[in-house]
Amino acid sequence: MRKVRFFLFICILIIPNLSFSDDKFLPNIAELVEDTSAAVVNVSVTKTVKTQSRHSPFPGSPKGFPFDDFFNFPFEEPKQQRERKISSGGSGFIISKDGYILTNHHVVADATEIVISLNDRREFKANLIGSDEKSDVALLKINTNEALPYLSLGNSDEIRVGDWVVAIGSPYRLNFSVTAGIVSAKSRSIPDQGTSYIPFIQSDVAINPGNSGGPLFNLKGEVIGINAMIYSSGGGYMGISFTIPINYASEIIDQLKNDGVVSRGWLGVSVQEVTKDLADSFKLGNPRGALIGNVLKDSPAERAGLKNGDVILSFNKQKIIYSGDLPLIVGRIKPDTTVDAVIFRSGIEKKMRVKVGVLEEIK
């Protein structure tokens, strides 16, 4: 009986400790939000679009007026171009006390007017300092003598898969909404979306239309990325969100501030994935690297001696595991820089020196 009582006593002591111990390991998101939300902004954008309309011989007649068909047949009335304004929006965040703001390029592209709203309902018109489509980063500025809150930028290279992260933004115009989750993957390449130069952070944080341009925080309250896009089969959140790492975005910001444009490295090759079957046929071992399918004429790759069928194993001393790693690495190298590369050709690893070119915009 004593043993039974003693056992029950131990259980009574242990069970409450187990039930309360879980709370110690949960992130204190409430304090983080209180400390950071004042510097998260809503970005309202006005755009002017042109539409075409056909002139009616009966102005003011209702749509489908019977004589419209009579007067328009068989001759086509000239179409008139009209301008109309449309509104859209997203999120952003203040990064300096003098009013610099980060958001996405796709949030402010083609904007004729940009208005920034803070959570205390203050509003400011913003100027577009620079915007880069390939990185989906845009830099705005508001000019005011008023005191502005701003956020600290963290080190996105330090985050680990499984770390807690928090997002604040304005999904579906529900301003300053908070969601949280964990990092699912790092350096995710999504070439099919035209974003092959962005080493995305993937997370399961709920991101929806309107969250674009908002910050992703670590638990220190530091910004580690700019929320940009989701994977979805129907347009809504499905548990897969993508964020531009702040370290990468900072490189873009510096160029936009100083030059107004962004320069990227260029190699001049098209590549494909090395499958297991290809790796076996090459006697490469484990599948890895980027298989060159085509070398452009007069490109940096051709001048360096790269050939079709070469497998690039490393570039600028960075290993290439998947083919999508190569454009991420090359794009971040300053043009005219000479770097080391390791390739696999005819069963042998070979070291090469490559002078990186500049990626020209296609007009």
Locate the predicted segments by residue.
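Bacterial N-terminal signal peptides that target proteins for export
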Residues: M1-F7
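Hydrophobic helical h-region of N-terminal Sec-dependent signal peptides
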Residues: F9-L13
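Residue-level detection of beta-strand scaffold positions
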Residues: V311, K351-M352
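Conserved PDZ fold ligand-binding element
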Residues: I101-H105, P300-S323
